[in-house]
């Protein structure tokens, strides 16, 4: 008797933090060349995929004001469907927990989970390299989530090397203001000539003197970024908070001795509308075991 195909699959999509973000150049086509360390964290969305008999991609509970053309999980499903030239259907239900426009990579992670999940659900047998190449068409951060491990990332996001990081806790604050990435990278005052560093250079001092080249521009465009940085600095003196990605979320590495009750009280005292969470670093994407490297 032949094995019945799997009918549904649920994946957790982790957010990420940029422990630093340097812009080291710009290509003739306008794309910026970056260096960063991407840290996976346990702030997750949930992607549920279900086979349907119709030959279509169906999204239930869509995000308000996000069209199917902009919806990364829909685009990811259609992309892999077209690439493999298959007549199969899927219903996608996305439960959002990671704030949108926060610099935490939630949309890219959801797209990666959709590609990984459909590769399993539809028995496509695509390897990690193929999935990553498809993911890059959706966004520069998608290949990292398909790679599935903490990484030193270069180029436009496609050069990814595994990096070993200690398990740490972080305080992450989102001041509830999305910053369009394009507004950061098109700004004439953005630093574009940061001297490149090496993995060893980062590991020699992973917690101190790490900066985000997008932060100064983001603070000018979005005053809430500076407000959030100041709030964390006052709440946790000496924590050296910085922005993640192109903003507007900021984060600080927590001292293991920080009292949990103090942290809970801090989160209760956040300015109205802000979102805060204490998160734990992850070593791997929860979907890592579904990804074939062959």
From Swiss-Prot:
InterPro entries: GHMP_kinase_C_dom, GHMP_kinase_C_sf, GHMP_kinase_N_dom, IspE, Ribosomal_Su5_D2-typ_SF, Ribsml_uS5_D2-typ_fold_subgr. GO terms for biological process: isopentenyl diphosphate biosynthetic process, methylerythritol 4-phosphate pathway; terpenoid biosynthetic process. Keywords: ATP-binding, Isoprene biosynthesis, Kinase, Nucleotide-binding, Transferase. It comes from the Bacteria. The active site is at 16, 141. It is an enzyme of class 2 (transferase). ATP binds at residues 99-109. It holds the Pfam family GHMP_kinases_N. Pathway: Isoprenoid biosynthesis; isopentenyl diphosphate biosynthesis via DXP pathway; isopentenyl diphosphate from 1-deoxy-D-xylulose 5-phosphate: step 3/6. Belongs to the GHMP kinase family. IspE subfamily. HAMAP family: IspE. This is 4-diphosphocytidyl-2-C-methyl-D-erythritol kinase. It comes from Polynucleobacter asymbioticus (strain DSM 18221 / CIP 109841 / QLW-P1DMWA-1) (Polynucleobacter necessarius subsp. asymbioticus). The gene is ispE.
């Amino acid at each position: 008797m032949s094995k019945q195909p799997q009918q549904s699959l649920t994946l957790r999509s982790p957010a990420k933090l940029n422990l630093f973000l340097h812009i080291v150049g710009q290509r003739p086509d306008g794309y910026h060349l970056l260096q960063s360390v991407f840290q996976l964290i346990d702030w997750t969305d949930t992607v549920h995929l279900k086979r349907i008999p119709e030959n279509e991609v169906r999204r239930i509970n869509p995000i308000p004001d996000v069209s199917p053309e902009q919806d990364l999980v829909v685009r990811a499903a259609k992309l892999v469907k077209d690439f493999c030239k298959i007549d199969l259907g899927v219903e996608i239900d996305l439960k959002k927990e990671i704030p949108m426009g926060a610099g935490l990579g939630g949309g890219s992670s959801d797209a990666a989970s959709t590609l990984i999940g459909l590769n399993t659900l539809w028995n496509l047998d695509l390897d990690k390299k193929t999935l990553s190449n498809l993911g890059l068409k959706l966004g520069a951060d998608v290949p990292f989530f398909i790679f599935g491990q903490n990484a030193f990332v270069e180029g436009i996001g496609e050069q990814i090397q595994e990096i070993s990081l200690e398990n740490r806790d972080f305080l992450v604050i989102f001041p509830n203001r999305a910053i369009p990435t394009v507004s950061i990278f098109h700004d004439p005052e953005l630093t574009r000539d940061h001297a490149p560093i090496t993995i060893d250079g980062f590991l020699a001092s992973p917690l101190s003197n790490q900066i985000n080249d997008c932060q100064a521009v983001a603070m000018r465009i979005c005053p809430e970024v500076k407000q959030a940085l100041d709030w964390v600095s006052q709440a946790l003196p000496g924590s050296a908070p910085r922005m993640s990605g192109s903003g507007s979320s900021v984060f600080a590495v927590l001292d293991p001795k920080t009292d949990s009750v103090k942290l809970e009280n801090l989160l209760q005292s956040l300015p109205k509308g802000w979102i805060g969470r204490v998160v734990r670093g992850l070593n791997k994407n929860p979907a890592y075991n579904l990804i074939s490297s062959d």
